[in-house]
Amino acid sequence: MSPIGSPDNVWLKPLRFEVALTVYLATLAWFAGWLPQGVTTTRWYRIYSACVVWAIAAEIIWIGGAASLGIASHFNESSPILGWTYRLMGGLAVLLTSSALVYGILILRNPNSRLDPAFKLSVGLGLVLTFVLTVAVAGYMANSGGHFVGISSTNAPGAPLMGWARDHGDLRVPHFFATHAMHFIPAFGFLAALALPHRRRTAPPLASAPSSPSSSPTRLARR
């Protein structure tokens, strides 16, 4: 939806995306401490991490630039150039989201993991499902040409901060829960690991965040 004529402040959308991407990168930096030993120093990981960070930078620049010009950054097919840019940004969004899939697989396949099995499974599944569900919902929205379902009958304002529609369907809601599966599912797994009596002595070590800054995708991209 174009920012022109929108009741939301024109900078709310860039702000939401910047906050979401910051949380996303911070979560991956935390989970990097549970990757197989040595993987963060491999050549493929460094190149891949750099590509992910550049994709995120491109998304932020495009969304902020579109807001400053007063044009829609999403679902904008008003000209060939804008349509091409929108599809390119969609491809970059898949690339940056794929890092959740890569992390999930690596954590699940880590034979030397010290995580509680229940928590390890929840972290891996949360990351994998973040990619699968986010791409599925985003792809459906892209093919539908928008995120609204149905027609507003009351013109009620959107939900505070998030802007979700309150009088008809809004696919941004499932998109939110899809992108945050990497947080919700591990949280349940952590509680489950603590609740199981025979697992209490091996509760998930949440303090095992990356001890070296080289584990962070953002750090690697700067090298």
Please describe what each predicted stretch is:
Residues 1-7, 25-48, 106-121, 141-145, ...:
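Juxtamembrane membrane-water interface segments of multi-pass membrane proteins
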Residues 36-39, 66-78:
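Helix-loop junctions on the outward
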Residues 5-15, 75-88, 117-121:
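Non-cytosolic membrane-interface motifs at loop->transmembrane helix junctions
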Residues 98-135, 139-156:
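Long hydrophobic alpha-helical segments that form multi-pass transmembrane helix bundles
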Residues 1-2, 12-34, 48-68, 88-103, ...:
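Hydrophobic cores of alpha-helical transmembrane segments in multi-pass integral membrane proteins
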Residues 140-182:
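Membrane-interfacial catalytic/cofactor-binding modules of polytopic membrane enzymes
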